[in-house]
Regions:
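Hydrophobic alpha-helical connector segments
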Residues: 64, 71-112
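Hydrophobic/aromatic-rich alpha-helical bundle segments in the mid-to-C-terminal region
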Residues: 106-107, 124-190
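N-terminal intrinsically disordered/low-complexity leader segments
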Residues: 1-14
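Short alpha-helical scaffolding segments that buttress acidic/His motifs in well-ordered protein cores
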Residues: 95-99, 112-117, 153-160
């Protein structure tokens, strides 16, 4: 047996990602209550000490997982905003498009984000992270993004996304599409 096979080469970046993937898997599969440091270490195939090197407690792990999912969402929304040629209401439209995309509901990413979103009332750090993210977008947003209409459209998008994740699809595809189109049209300049 070579020395290489006897000792795993240390790669802290890879281990960090592996731990977050394991945490995401557990959160999406079993919920936030099942997300313990022992469970994540076991899922990742590392010692608890290896996990504690990166995440000193459960809150740090949950925050890192939420930040990772928020970064994925940020990338997708930024891509949608860049592709949108109409500047008026661009953020709200991208937010609506991202959360109302039917294919998002069926992803592990969406399930993980839902689990962490539902944990926000009990996790002030997550609430602050989400609030800061939203306020940063609104600070860069325009009149529509900061209006009652923009808020209504984003809250409706949240509702569509969350209801499909928690209740399944309760409206026909046609009804859903008409609802999303109505919301989309509310974001366009008149």
């Amino acid at each position: 047996m070579s020395i290489e096979t006897q000792h795993r080469k240390k790669d802290p970046v890879r281990l960090y990602r592996q731990l977050l993937e394991s945490a995401a898997t557990i959160a999406g599969r079993d919920g936030i209550a099942a997300l313990s440091l022992n469970a994540v270490a076991y899922e990742a195939g590392v010692s608890k000490g290896g996990l504690l090197h990166h995440f000193p407690n459960k809150q740090a792990l949950i925050f890192a997982l939420f930040a990772r999912l928020l970064a994925i969402m940020e990338d997708a929304i930024s891509t949608l905003m860049t592709a949108d040629t109409t500047s008026y209401g661009r953020f709200t439209r991208a937010y609506l498009h991202y959360l109302s995309a039917p294919e998002l509901t069926d992803t592990q990413e969406s399930r993980q984000l839902m689990v962490l979103s539902l944990a926000m009332p009990d996790e002030p750090v997550l609430r602050k992270c989400w609030r800061d993210w939203m306020l940063a977008h609104l600070a860069q947003g325009d009149e529509l993004d900061n209006s009652h209409t923009g808020t209504l459209v984003r809250y409706a998008a949240d509702g569509i996304w969350l209801s499909e994740l928690t209740e399944g699809r309760t409206m026909s595809a046609e009804h859903r599409q008409a609802l999303v189109e109505t919301l989309y049209n509310m974001t366009l300049p008149t």
